[in-house]
């Protein structure tokens, strides 16, 4: 199912950008936060560990992260999972030991206006491939396997 606000989404599209937004010390602080967070998912088949950036675990780091994103994006709303209390998580950490399958993170609700993806690598090892193709449906994974 496609998003209902496709025209608005298309107006916000731009080419991918690589921006060195965080200092080495800030990346170190985010890495330390990652190491302190509980594992949310350990998908052994895909060899991925996922953790949620819990709000208020480190309030100064929360404020720094949001402030830095606003410098680049302006005002924004995160499309994230919610805690049991209804609070937004500041994103998900993915520690991947194998390539991720082809997927799109385009929001969960058809009325959402998807905006930008922010990827913050915490190590110099690894690559992210961004395709020029567009997908205007909700978040999904792609496969040629019909089963």
What are these regions, as identified by a protein language model?
Residues 1-147:
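Fe(II)/2-oxoglutarate oxygenase catalytic core
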């Amino acid at each position: 199912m496609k998003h209902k606000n496709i025209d608005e989404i298309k107006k916000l599209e731009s080419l991918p950008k690589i921006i060195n937004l965080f200092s080495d010390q800030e990346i170190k602080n985010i890495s330390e936060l990652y190491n302190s967070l509980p594992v949310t998912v350990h998908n052994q088949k895909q060899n991925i560990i996922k953790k949620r950036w819990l709000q208020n675990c480190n309030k100064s780091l929360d404020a720094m992260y949001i402030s830095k994103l606003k410098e680049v994006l302006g005002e924004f709303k995160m499309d994230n999972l919610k805690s049991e209390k209804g609070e937004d998580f500041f994103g998900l950490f993915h520690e991947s030991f194998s390539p991720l399958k082809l997927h799109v993170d385009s929001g969960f609700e058809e009325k959402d206006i998807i905006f930008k993806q922010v990827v913050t690598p915490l190590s110099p090892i690894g690559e992210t491939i961004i395709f020029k193709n567009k997908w205007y449906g909700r978040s999904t994974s792609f496969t040629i396997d019909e089963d």
